[in-house]
């Protein structure tokens, strides 16, 4: 279990073997008031992504597990008007991202992950770029019907990257894989409180 608390917040992440329970509360979360959440993650797939990624710097590494397509059940309540978001395990999913390591001080890491249903079957993906020496290993995976399928190289085509001092992150991105198994377009949405 992991627990952290401060003056205006507390978060508890419980590992109950066949489920994970997240309980969080934060006063003054945003302009509309406080946040309270209790979400339970269940139905852990038999296969997940586990990786130990080296860095070029000696004795630096990242050990990570991603569990996609876990069913989510619970509520998040936010604001003075108690706006409540309910997660139904029939159609709500989560990814559990657990990692440890010795990281280099300066990093650039792009990460994408999703879980949901395609034709009534659980489907998810995990892609990563730029964190550690990914020529040795990558975290690129597809998840379908509880099985993990390894992807090799996934290229992140970042708008304006490669010629501009600052990439234009709000323009559409595209992703391609060397084997043609993962092709995706993504248009960013910026929503800040």
Segments (PLM) and residue ranges:
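Structured soluble/peripheral alpha/beta segments that form catalytic or ligand/cofactor-binding pockets
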Residues: 1-193
């Amino acid at each position: 279990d992991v627990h952290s608390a401060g003056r205006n917040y507390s978060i508890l992440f419980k590992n109950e073997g066949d489920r994970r329970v997240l309980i969080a509360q934060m006063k003054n979360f945003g302009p509309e008031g406080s946040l309270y959440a209790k979400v339970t993650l269940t139905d852990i797939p038999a296969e997940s992504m586990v990786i130990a990624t080296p860095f070029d710097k000696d004795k630096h590494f990242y050990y990570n597990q991603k569990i996609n397509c876990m069913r989510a059940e619970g509520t998040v309540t936010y604001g003075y008007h108690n706006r409540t978001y309910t997660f139904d395990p029939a159609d709500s999913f989560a990814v559990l991202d657990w990692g440890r390591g010795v990281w280099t001080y300066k990093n650039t890491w792009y990460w994408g992950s999703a879980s949901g249903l395609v034709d009534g079957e659980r489907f998810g993906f995990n892609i990563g770029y730029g964190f550690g020496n990914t020529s040795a290993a990558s975290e690129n995976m597809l998840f379908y019907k509880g099985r993990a399928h390894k992807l090799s190289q996934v290229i992140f085509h970042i708008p304006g990257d490669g010629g501009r001092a600052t990439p234009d992150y709000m323009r559409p991105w595209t992703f391609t894989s060397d084997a043609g198994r993962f092709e995706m377009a993504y248009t960013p949405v910026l929503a800040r409180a």
